[in-house]
Design a protein with these regions (language model features):
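Hydrophobic transmembrane-helix microenvironments that flank and shape a buried ionizable site
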Residues: 7, 94, 119-123, 193, ...
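Hydrophobic alpha-helical segments and helix pairs
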Residues: 103-143
């Protein structure tokens, strides 16, 4: 009952987000914008997004191996895509991360606490990097921020340096088991976020948006990514779109194109999650065949 309530709340939030979006931008303008999209740009966008997932799985593998979970990369990659599928469709506590933890705990000597810690630290590292890139992009559009706060570019840079120093010190003190891979996974996180940003830029190119505006779209894209990382909806659906459309006025960009690019990115991530579902079905079928042959 509790899981059903959470599921219904997420659906309600998605509906609210889209309601607010369509109050700001008409469906006709979105439809017209999508019709103008060059479909060829979906190919590099899809490839770049999947490359980011391959590297994300490799980053997480380093965290697991730090606590003695020696799983082959290919199996971990399959597990990563399966968890994307479960995270997309299963409500409540049965999330993608929970699936990874349960799966590995049954096949290793690591405790639930250790595996949960590794998974959460992996996410925190990625989120910290995401916020850092968003801040660096924001420096390019300080004119927008300075309308509300008299901020300087060097203030943001200093805050980033201090923030990363604090992050590294706390991480090394509180989670010494992962000290050996801390800098490596951080480097992975920067590459992963850049790959996802490039994937989004491919979608912008498909809408023939001039490169001079990509930074503005990118800032809102990262803002939406931060919001969609929260367990508020299904795969961030509606949340990222709401952020881009709401912020489009501040950034002086086309709200219909902002929504459409964000929606296509969400669609790509959803398709990748479905790939995880196919992998899961194939593994279940193979498992049944092995069981039948052994009888």
């Amino acid at each position: 009952m509790k899981s059903l309530l959470k599921w219904l709340l997420k659906i309600g939030l998605i509906a609210l987000a889209f309601y607010l979006v369509f109050k700001k931008v008409s469906w006709e303008s979105i439809k017209e914008t999508l019709q103008q999209f060059s479909l060829w740009w979906l190919i590099p966008a899809f490839i770049l997004y999947n490359l980011s997932q391959f590297l994300s799985a490799y980053r997480l593998l380093h965290m697991f191996r730090s606590v003695g979970v020696n799983i082959p990369y290919v199996r971990n990659l399959q597990l990563y895509y399966k968890s994307m599928f479960y995270g997309l469709f299963l409500p409540g506590g049965v999330s993608g991360d929970a699936y990874k933890v349960i799966y590995l705990q049954k096949r290793s000597e690591a405790s639930y606490k250790t595996l949960i810690t590794a998974t959460l630290l992996d996410r925190v590292n990625g989120l910290t990097t995401l916020l850092s890139i968003a801040a660096l992009l924001l420096i390019q559009r300080l004119d927008v921020l300075q309308e509300y706060v008299p901020v300087k570019a060097w203030w943001i840079i200093i805050l980033l340096i201090i923030g990363w120093l604090v992050y590294f010190l706390l991480h090394r003190k509180l989670f010494p088991a992962f000290n050996g891979v801390l800098f490596k996974i951080t480097a992975f996180s920067w590459v992963i976020q850049c790959l996802q940003l490039l994937s989004f830029f491919c979608l912008l190119k498909g809408f023939a948006i001039v490169a001079e505006q990509w930074i503005s779209y990118g800032i809102l894209f990262y803002g939406g990514s931060v919001m969609s990382a929260l367990p508020l909806s299904i795969n961030g659906l509606g949340i990222r779109e709401w952020v881009l459309v709401t912020g489009s006025g501040l950034m002086m960009i086309d709200s219909a194109k902002a929504f459409s690019a964000s929606f296509l990115f969400t669609l790509i991530s959803g398709v990748c999650a479905l790939i995880g579902g196919i992998i899961q079905i194939r593994s279940q079928v193979a498992g049944r065949e092995v069981a039948n042959n052994s009888q």
